Swiss-Prot record:
The keyword Ribonucleoprotein applies. Part of the 30S ribosomal subunit. Contacts proteins S5 and S12. GO terms for biological process: translation. The lineage of its organism: Bacteria, Pseudomonadati, Thermodesulfobacteriota, Desulfovibrionia, Desulfovibrionales. This is Small ribosomal subunit protein uS8. GO terms for molecular function: rRNA binding; structural constituent of ribosome. It comes from Oleidesulfovibrio alaskensis (strain ATCC BAA-1058 / DSM 17464 / G20) (Desulfovibrio alaskensis). NCBIfam families: PRK00136.1. One of the primary rRNA binding proteins, it binds directly to 16S rRNA central domain where it helps coordinate assembly of the platform of the 30S subunit. Coiled coil: none annotated. One of its GO terms (cellular component) is ribosome. Keywords: Ribonucleoprotein, Ribosomal protein, RNA-binding, rRNA-binding.
Length: 126
C-alpha cells in the first residue's frame, strides 16, 4: 500500500526519464488521470493511455534529453500546503508549472489564478 500515490507517480516519471525509457506505467486513479492530462496539455509528456488498472504515460524528449528537468512534491501526507489565489507561486521564473487541487478540480497554477481559486499545492514541474 502506498502512503503517497502522487509522489510515487512523480518518482516513477523521474526515474523513467533518467533511464531514458519511452513510457512508464503508474497505478490508475482519478487524481493521477487529472495530473497526466495537465502534463499533456502543458507539453511535458507526449500522451497517456488508460488501461484497466494503470495509466501508461509516453514520455517526451527533445534532442535526446528529457523535457521535464525537475519534479517536486510540495504538499505531502504529513504536511499539507494550501495557497490562496494570490499566493500561487511562479515556478522557475515562469518556466515551470505548479499543479493545485482546487474546488474546481485539479488545475495548473495560471488557470487557478485566472479563475481566482486557491487550493492544495500538489507539485511543481519544470
Amino acid at each position: 500500500m502506498l502512503t503517497d500515490p502522487i509522489a510515487d507517480m512523480l518518482t516513477r516519471i523521474r526515474n523513467a526519464h533518467l533511464a531514458l525509457h519511452k513510457e512508464v506505467s503508474v497505478p490508475r486513479s482519478k487524481m493521477k488521470e487529472a495530473l497526466a492530462a495537465i502534463l499533456k496539455e502543458e507539453g511535458y509528456i507526449t500522451d497517456f493511455k488508460m488501461e484497466e488498472s494503470s495509466i501508461v504515460i509516453e514520455l517526451k524528449y527533445f534532442k535526446g534529453k528529457p523535457v521535464i528537468s525537475g519534479l517536486k512534491r510540495i504538499s505531502k501526507s504529513g504536511r499539507r500546503v494550501y495557497v490562496g489565489s494570490t499566493d500561487i507561486p511562479r515556478v522557475q521564473n515562469g518556466l515551470g508549472i505548479c499543479i493545485l487541487s482546487t474546488s474546481s478540480g485539479v488545475l495548473e497554477g495560471t488557470n487557478a489564478r485566472s479563475k481566482n481559486v486557491g487550493g492544495e499545492l500538489l507539485c511543481e514541474i519544470w
